[in-house]
Design a protein with these regions (language model features):
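Short, charge-dense linear interaction motifs
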Residues: 1-216
Length: 216
C-alpha cells in the first residue's frame, strides 16, 4: 500500500455585483468652528444623496460617521511661530448594486473640494459567492482525484482511494480583470465636478483548494 498526498485546486470567475466606496469629507481651517462648518455642510449633502440612492435601490447598504475635529501645528518658515491648524472630518461608506449610479455619484462629489473618494472595493452578492465557493470546492476535489490517479498510474499502482481530506486556510474572493480599486479609484475623485465617472466592474475570482490523502 502506497500513500499519495496531493493538493487539488480550482477557480471560478463571475462579474462583480457589489461596489463599496468610502467618501471622506475633510476641511482645514484656522478655527475649529470654520473647519466643522465646512465639513458639516459637505457631509450632510453626501448623507442626503446616499439616503436617496438607497431609497432608489442603487445602494444596498450604507452608514455615516459623525464629524469630528483634530488639530496639529504646521511649520510655516524659519524663525516664525508654528501655525495651529484644525481639521474636521467625516465619512460615508456605501455599497452599490448599480455601477452607473456609483459613477454618477463620484462625478457629483468632484464638484465639492471637501470630498475625497477612497478606493472602490468590488465583491459578489453573498448568494453568488456561496454558490461559486461550493462549486469550486467540488472541482478542487475532482482535481485532486485526477492528480492522484495520474501518480498511481505512473507508479503502476491500483486505483487510489481517499483516506483523508484537509482544507487549507481559505483564500478570499479577489478582483480579476478590469475590477478597479485602491489608488486608481482614488484618482477618480479628481474628475470634473458633475461629470459621471466610467467604472468597469470586471470579474471576481473565487478560489478553492483541498489537500487529499489517498492509498493505492
Amino acid at each position: 500500500v502506497v500513500e499519495i498526498l496531493v493538493r487539488g485546486e480550482a477557480a471560478l470567475r463571475a462579474a462583480a455585483e457589489r461596489a463599496t466606496v468610502t467618501v471622506h469629507s475633510r476641511w482645514q481651517a484656522d478655527a475649529p468652528d470654520a473647519a466643522m462648518a465646512a465639513v458639516t455642510t459637505a457631509h450632510a449633502a453626501a448623507v442626503e444623496r446616499a439616503r436617496a440612492l438607497a431609497a432608489a435601490g442603487a445602494i444596498e447598504s450604507w452608514h455615516a460617521d459623525r464629524a469630528w475635529v483634530s488639530h496639529h501645528r504646521e511649520w510655516v518658515g524659519e524663525g516664525l511661530p508654528q501655525r495651529l491648524v484644525f481639521t474636521a472630518s467625516a465619512a460615508v461608506t456605501a455599497t452599490f448594486v448599480d455601477v452607473d449610479a456609483l459613477g454618477a455619484w463620484i462625478g457629483e462629489l468632484g464638484s465639492a473640494p471637501e470630498h475625497e473618494v477612497g478606493g472602490v472595493t468590488w465583491s459578489l452578492a453573498d448568494e453568488t459567492e456561496r454558490r461559486l465557493s461550493s462549486r469550486a470546492r467540488e472541482l478542487a476535489v475532482e482535481d485532486a482525484r485526477a492528480r492522484a490517479a495520474d501518480y498511481a498510474s505512473a507508479a503502476a499502482l491500483g486505483e487510489p482511494a481517499i483516506t483523508a481530506i484537509r482544507e487549507p486556510d481559505p483564500a478570499p474572493a479577489r478582483p480579476f480583470g478590469k475590477a478597479r480599486g485602491g489608488a486608481e479609484a482614488a484618482m477618480l475623485a479628481s474628475a470634473d465636478g458633475g461629470a459621471p465617472v466610467a467604472l468597469s466592474a470586471g470579474e471576481i475570482e473565487v478560489e478553492a483548494a483541498v489537500e487529499v490523502a489517498f492509498r493505492a
